[in-house]
């Protein structure tokens, strides 16, 4: 079942992030981040539930640029390995595309790591074009950043 995320989904999303994405973050921290997103109208989390358990999710946000109309950006998409190749990722992607279209967004954009070799194939199959390859820089202000 495809639906909007709620606070009860925090644990399942935390497990997916740990097992499938490699993000080892304390549950309480992850839960607080998810709740903050749920309370932010510029962001959405959609989940796919099977037998009462969230097996996949997508997180997207409004992406405002000074030189383009607003877009939505996908910040995360993950499906438990056992449930992959069953159309769940595509259903989640369509939820974001519908939200983007309904809100008047110009496009949906995303970035994916070069180490995620299946992701480019998936996104191209869903009509996404590779726009450019780029470097990603980050400067941390605390020592407890795990992603």
Model-predicted regions and their roles:
Residues 76-79, 85-98, 125:
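Conserved acetyl-CoA-binding loop-helix of GNAT-fold acetyltransferases
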Residues 109-119, 138, 142:
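Conserved beta-strand-loop-alpha-helix junction that forms the acyl-donor binding cleft
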Residues 124-133:
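Conserved acetyl-CoA-binding loop of GNAT-fold acetyltransferases
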């Amino acid at each position: 079942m495809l639906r909007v995320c709620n606070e009860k989904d925090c644990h399942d999303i935390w497990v997916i992030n740990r097992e499938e994405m490699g993000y080892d973050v304390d549950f309480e921290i992850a839960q607080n981040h998810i709740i903050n997103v749920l309370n932010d109208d510029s962001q959405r989390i959609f989940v796919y539930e099977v037998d009462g358990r969230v097996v996949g999710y997508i997180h997207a946000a409004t992406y405002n640029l000074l030189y383009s109309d607003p877009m939505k950006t996908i910040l995360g998409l993950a499906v438990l390995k056992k449930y992959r190749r069953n159309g769940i990722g595509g259903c989640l992607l369509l939820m974001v595309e519908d939200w983007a279209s309904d809100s008047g967004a110009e496009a949906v954009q995303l970035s994916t790591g070069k180490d995620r070799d299946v992701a480019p194939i998936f996104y191209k199959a869903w009509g996404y074009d590779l726009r450019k390859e780029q470097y990603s820089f980050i400067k941390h202000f605390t020592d407890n950043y795990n992603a």
